[in-house]
Amino acid sequence: MTELELLGPRASGQPLGTAILKAVAEDFQVDEVLDIPLSGQGEHLWLWVEKRDLNTEEAARRLARAAGVPVRSISYAGLKDRQALTRQWFSLHLPGKADPDLSRAEDATLRVLKQVRHQRKLQRGAHSANGFTLRLTALAADHAALDARLQTLKQQGVPNYFGGQRFGHGGGNVQDAQHWAARKALPEQRNVRSRLLSAARSYLFNQVLAARVADGSWQRAQVGDLLAFTDSRSFFSAGEQECSDPRLAILDLHPTGPMWGEGPSPAAGAALTLETAIGQQHALLCQWLANAGMSHERRILRLPIGGLTWHYPEPDILQLEFVLPAGCFATVVVRELVDLVPAGQTDSPCVF
């Protein structure tokens, strides 16, 4: 499956050139944003961890081994990219135990930067956002055109597609999900089941968003749309009055698309017509998600880019810094700028 099939059309027009992302881990840096005050006491030890070219699950296993606890005793808010330099929180459940020596978990790929006690464990999805520092190298694009495009993205956001990494190489996760859906069965392995259900829901959401990008309605509320605020999981129906809510214009409020599950879409009007049509095109996949017990949820169609800044450390390097809500993909921001080509190596440092 191609990127266009998995995501959909760009909203900003043709890419302005080409670049490399992730030539080295430092080119893709992620800092988890967690708005939880830690008490300094309790049976949970929270760890602020920096990892390089290491996925979250492997980091959790290493920390658990070093602490001498089962991996189920360690928690994290979300999964971060492997091919990156990331900083995120973990928590270890250590009732009645002293702080363990975690040095055995540390090497060039993992460092524990801070540890603090707290009364509660870290819950999945507890982080409010992720901060990104991206370095695009081997840049072949006009700076003036990039500056103008970036200014537009800052003002109007980008389509909130799920990024290609959600779907596996060539869309393999979607194809596997379709295979299981045709059999009306679920994988026995929990992690495989979770990955394929997530890929299927993400693919269907992208199909709806792609249609709305194509007709220009992805950032415009229509009567019958379900609207949501950037950081809220709740939503409400749009009537004539809601469609002119000034919070839409300042990127606080957005139309949403479906995260498929049990029951019909609660949307109405043109949104319901579109979502029903997409559901009929992928009936087996939708029924598979419903049978798996997934509940119908909503996701904003438009992704506001918080605190977007950029500069050029070298003529052929563009460095971007911005913040995105949890669960959103930095690569869909880059996609509106340039085409990415396979990674090579560069010697230019990342400037902060």
Swiss-Prot record:
GO CC annotation, single: cytosol
Ranges of residues in domain TRUD: 157-303
A Pfam family reported for this protein in Swiss-Prot or TrEMBL: TruD
Keyword Transferase (UniProt): no
Family: Belongs to the pseudouridine synthase TruD family.
HAMAP family given in the database record: TruD
UniProt protein name: tRNA pseudouridine synthase D
Species this chain originates from: Pseudomonas putida (strain W619)
Signal sequence bounds: none
Function: Responsible for synthesis of pseudouridine from uracil-13 in transfer RNAs.
Keywords noted in UniProt: Isomerase, tRNA processing
GO MF: RNA binding; tRNA pseudouridine(13) synthase activity
GO terms classed as biological process: tRNA pseudouridine synthesis
EC numbers, comma separated: 5.4.99.27
Catalytic residues of the enzyme: 81
Cited NCBIfam families: PRK00984.1-2
